[in-house]
Amino acid sequence: MVTPVTWMDNPIEVYVNDSEWVPGPTDDRCPAKPEEEGMMINISIGYRYPPICLGTAPGCLMPAVQNWLVEVPIVSPISRFTYHMVSGMSLRPRVNYLQDFPYQRSLKFRPKGKPCPKEIPKESKNTEVLVWEECVANSAVILQNNEFGTIIDWAPRGQFYHNCSGQTQSCPSAQVSPAVDSDLTESLDKHKHKKLQSFYPWEWGEKGISTPRPKIISPVSGPEHPELWRLTVASHHIRIWSGNQTLETRDRKPFYTVDLNSSLTLPLQSCVKPPYMLVVGNIVIKPDSQTITCENCRLLTCIDSTFNWQHRILLVRAREGVWILVSMDRPWEASPSVHILTEVLKGVLNRSKRFIFTLIAVIMGLIAVTATGAVAGVALHSSVQSVNFVNDWQKNSTRLWNSQSSIDQKLANQINDLRQTVIWMGDRLMSLEHRFQLQCDWNTSDFCITPQIYNESEHHWDMVRHHLQGREDNLTLDISKLKEQIFEASKAHLNLVPGTEAIAGVADGLANLNPVTWVKTIGSTTIINLILILVCLFCLLLVCRCTQQLRRDSDHRERAMMTMAVLSKRKGGNVGKSKRDQIVTVSV
């Protein structure tokens, strides 16, 4: 899941392990995971804008040796000038004056910055430091001009040439470089002595100690990418030269000699940090299909002097996500509470007892889930605001750290780490924000299944395949447009209570349990309603009569019971009395 870094992307941070000879952020602790360096990978990805590639292949910027020269105080009476020169791997110009001349001096593409000096920069006798100062040359060099795009560089390209001013005879004005060898490694390894001789004075053109900053100007215009040079310069060690230019007399004519010697080389290492990585191997870029393929490539984070330029380097970064088509064997549901609600209510409808309490409990669960999502959304929104504030507050603190103390260098490295970390965190938070805004199926946690229905007529499989490869040139597959469609579908689900269909089924079931509906179904006419009223009155009457009869029977039983109780009480008290009295008593 990687996507190429293109010329339209912002420059990334490339860290070197030596700040005295190479400007920019430094870090000698890379790679972070040495055991994972060189992992094999096969890639087949697409692109929209031209990708950034380094190496000897179509669509890639080719390497070349570049020199940077400074003057030092003269130490010999026969020397016109004394030099210190640094040679290292850089980016090769591809000059075509007839086709590329309009680009080379066009003010439209000229960057803002200080012009390069008119004189060679002065330096002390100490060769242990090199002060870099960014400047803009009088004309640009063409690094690439083909079907992949036009890439230029406004950094100075210093080299020796003949000074023909004031010369009456024919003077060869062609530029000559002390490193013109076709074999790059041979020019930096085997040739440790350079000598240039001529009857004309030697001059150094394109003064200035500045690093290349290539940028694309066609078919689109993008930002400068100074980090690419830090990758190429670390692919081979840099060589330090010392020498001078002497003036002699030959055949009664002045004779000029530039003599340079080298006995010092410095190995370098350049690294990128996640989410960026380097794909190294036989990379093939196909502009017709806008795809990049590489089989049996290696995935690296660092480049050092052991790199072989028979391979190519492709800058890639981890992809935030991809939209794919899926099919489900069940209805799409937004949360587990909806699923539980549906399953529970199926059983509850068959058993009406405790239905209201269960319904209240489930609804309270839905409210709790909704409240949790709302709180999470607020927290995420606050986090995004904090990241934007940090991004606005954070400034580009990359300077010429080689002229600062060691503690300033450490602070600079921490700031660079913070900046790249903040950018990475910002991308992750934006991805999380989109994730929270989407309505996803509850039964998948590693990825999000949205309720958006796939329309084959609008997005046929070729478009989907291009999207999976990373190509976004088709407007119908533009990610932002697709997200808007999915957000609209999600909002449609958010406008309704989750589980609306299940709750609607419950409402229908409750309506069927209502006796009033039965009466309405049976008694839809006045006669039936009247008969029902008479039946009700008859039943009421019958109940009243039964109640009265029961009360009378109860009164008779009470009197009989009282009489029997009185007779039982007087049975023994009448013995010895006269028969008359007994009769009277009985009569009473």
Curated annotation (Swiss-Prot):
Retroviral envelope proteins mediate receptor recognition and membrane fusion during early infection. Endogenous envelope proteins may have kept, lost or modified their original function during evolution. This is Endogenous retrovirus group K member 24 Env polyprotein. The chain crosses the membrane at residues 522-542. Residues 355-375 are annotated as: Fusion peptide. The surface (SU) and transmembrane (TM) proteins form a heterodimer. SU and TM are attached by noncovalent interactions or by a labile interchain disulfide bond. It holds the Pfam family GP41. One of its GO terms (molecular function) is structural molecule activity. InterPro entries: GP41-like, HERV-K_env, Retroviral_env_glycoprotein. The gene is ERVK-24. The record marks R354, F355 as: Cleavage.
